[in-house]
Regions:
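Extended, low-polarity segments enriched in aliphatic/aromatic residues
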Residues: 2-61, 71-80, 85-374
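Terminal amphipathic helices with adjacent charged low-complexity linkers/tails
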Residues: 66-67
Length: 374
């Protein structure tokens, strides 16, 4: 497979310009205007942030992309699907309220918001996965599949289960209905190391399934209630909650890649990622820890696999921030350094599996040429 082209611009802005100007120029240079959008529905998939989290992308970025679509005659809308776990985005009404509270509305973004899998997270379409090994079909939000054109606008950051969350996670996990998310997460559930557990109850507060109790002042997980979402792993500050089966995370990664293929296959798609506020964990948390790496820039491509690879490569070259989860890990005298910022931040992850699987089934390629946009 030939190399894909990924376009990049940094966040430096001379007087008289803005990041929004640079984002628009990046998208235009990358070829967004080559897509025929006239009179067509354009789904812009992004994450509206959990209440309390402040690392999610600002609505201004969404408006920049939506405005470009409207200039081409497109009919854009922002979308995301409901969460698997209870929280502020578990149904469409609360999800929309959360989006509004975090600044996303028709005025701030220039387009409407549609929750992709409907009121209860059950409005889904069963979509074939071409060349799928782990999923023959994917359960995707109906409104997302109804769109003529698909654009992902992703916040690239760390993740406690997948290593990082970029375009493929935004698409694969994010576009899955609640049942689709469950099918992806079903491959593994966390465990507790009692020797490390301090009974602080942070994991129970983060759990959306009421699956964690403390009968002996140590966390105990009820696996009949646990959905395997992994939020408790990110909540624990003492590494007491962990994934006992590293292959479970790898299986999650590969399923996620196949779901992303189901979303993109057979229609025009374009992808943008902003590598900033690189928190160690998912934006699904109701909080965000300090960034583990400095802000890097914005990337765009027609190939989501190459895009994620380029973002990851840029992060791996960056210098860790000392006062962060990653910096603290690396400063430990007994820390086994993986020479991989994502794995050193969250050790029980296998992020390369997502890219490997996506490339294997033909969604894109990990080989890319990086072009700089000034």
């Amino acid at each position: 497979m030939e190399k894909s082209t990924v376009y990049f611009t940094d966040f430096r802005c001379p007087v008289g310009t803005s990041q929004l100007d640079k984002l628009k120029k990046l998208c235009v240079t990358a070829g967004i205007k080559n897509i025929d959008m006239d009179g067509k529905f354009v789904a812009i998939k992004m994450h509206f942030g959990e209440l309390g989290n402040l690392a999610f992308l600002r609505p201004n970025y969404a408006k920049a992309v939506a405005d470009l679509c409207k200039e081409q005659g497109g009919l854009p809308f922002l979308t995301d699907c409901n969460t698997l776990y209870p929280g502020s985005r578990k149904n469409a009404l609360e999800h929309l309220e959360c989006a509004n509270l975090n600044g996303f509305n028709s005025i701030s973004t220039g387009c409407q918001i549609i929750i992709g899998d409907g009121l209860r997270g059950t409005d889904e379409v069963e979509v074939p996965v071409v060349n799928g090994e782990y999923c023959q079909t994917a359960l995707i939000g109906h409104a997302i599949m109804d769109a003529d054109i698909f654009i992902s606008l992703s916040h690239f950051k760390g993740h406690e289960a997948t290593g990082f969350g970029g375009a493929l996670k935004n698409i694969g996990m994010g576009c899955g209905s609640r049942a689709g998310k469950m099918k992806q997460h079903a491959s593994g559930k966390p465990a507790v190391n009692e020797e490390l557990c301090r009974g602080c109850r942070r994991c129970a507060k983060e759990c959306g399934s009421d699956a964690i109790t403390y009968p002996n002042k140590k966390a105990v997980i009820d696996y009949d209630k646990c959905k395997g979402c992994g939020r408790c792993i990110g909540a624990c500050g003492f590494d007491a909650v962990y994934n006992p089966n590293s292959s479970a995370n790898e299986l999650l990664d590969r399923k996620m890649a196949e779901y992303a293929q189901a979303v993109c296959h057979g229609r025009p798609h374009f992808h943008v990622a902003l590598v900033q506020d690189i928190s160690p964990n998912c934006d699904c948390h109701g909080e965000n820890d300090a960034p583990i790496l400095p802000d890097i820039g914005m990337f765009a491509s027609f190939d989501p696999v190459a895009l994620d690879q380029a973002c990851a490569d840029a992060c791996l070259k960056a210098t860790p921030i000392e006062n962060s989860q990653l910096g603290e890990h690396l400063a430990k005298p007994d820390w086994h350094c993986h020479h991989d910022h994502f794995k050193d931040s969250n050790p029980n992850i296998e992020w390369k599996a997502t890219l490997d699987q996506a490339e294997k089934i033909g969604l894109g390629t990990r080989q890319y040429e990086l072009k700089i946009v000034k």
